[in-house]
Amino acid sequence: MKNVRIIGLGLMGTNLGLNLISKGIKVYGEDVSDYANNRASKLGIDINKTDEEIDLTILAMPVNKIISYLKENKKISNTKALLDIGGTKQEICDLMDQSEIPSIGGHPMCGLADNNSWEPTPEIYEKATFLLCETESTSEDSKTIISNFLKLLNAEEVWIERERHDEIISITSHIPHLISSALVGIAKDDYQINEIMGMAAGGFDGATRLTRTNPEMIIDMYDTNSKNINKFLKVFLKEISEIMDLQERKELIDYLSSSVEWRRALSEKFGERPLS
């Protein structure tokens, strides 16, 4: 792999470009924002147009913008393969099915909770799990290109069906974001900030750090995955209702112990992940 084009030079796109540059890859980039283009250019991403054939074009925009881009650009010039890194996959992959370019849906399991920070952090992609969804336009050559791309990142390649991806990601990412916001809602509506911060420690900080996420990303995930989010919010409310119905101390201990055992088993198998 010699060169990559990244469309969308926000936090994720720029950091991906910087990671690839550090591996000796020529990175071209473009964004609708002049500010983003200028920032990326100063960091070493080439924002000039090129007629050179591109090995891989990556769509690194918010989900709804990726969807709009795919609707308007069924054919993308001088590229061998197309990949997106959006947080939901069903709608994106449905559009990629119709693409004239061999296309694969992607979702790197990395990022920063505070995605309004512009400090370069290209290392977030290193050794990340990279979820991939095949589409009707996917070719064997495009799979090889993606595999080589992920080797550059030292990332783990995991293939998953688009429907299954969106179902699971609603539990592991989308619902936690909404619960985090709900907890902040309780705190800010009922208590003074000095009272909250004077008594807050790891529990509150850990449970609410996701509220630092750009609201546009949250709206995108809800717009494109509302069916799964609503389904599991109902499951979550049922779980809360069951906790409220526990009458005996032993019942609550048993409930909490079951959760502790499951979470510890998860940590033992996969290790603890650093908070970002």
Residue ranges of model-derived segments:
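N-terminal Rossmann-like NAD(P) cofactor-binding module of classical short-chain dehydrogenase/reductase
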Residues: 57-58, 83
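Residues at the starts of beta-strands that form the adenosine-phosphate
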Residues: 3, 26, 102, 129, ...
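Internal alpha-helical scaffold of NAD(P)-dependent oxidoreductase catalytic cores
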Residues: 124-209
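Rossmann-like NAD(P)(H) cofactor-binding subdomain of soluble oxidoreductases
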Residues: 63, 69-119
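Hydrophobic Val/Ile/Leu positions in short beta-strands of Rossmann-like dinucleotide-binding domains
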Residues: 5-6, 59, 132
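NAD(P)+-binding Rossmann beta1-loop-alpha1 motif at the extreme N-terminus of oxidoreductases
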Residues: 1-49
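Interdomain hinge/lid region at the active-site interface
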Residues: 193-263
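Alpha-helix C-terminal capping/helix-to-coil transition sites in glycosyltransferase folds
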Residues: 52-53, 127
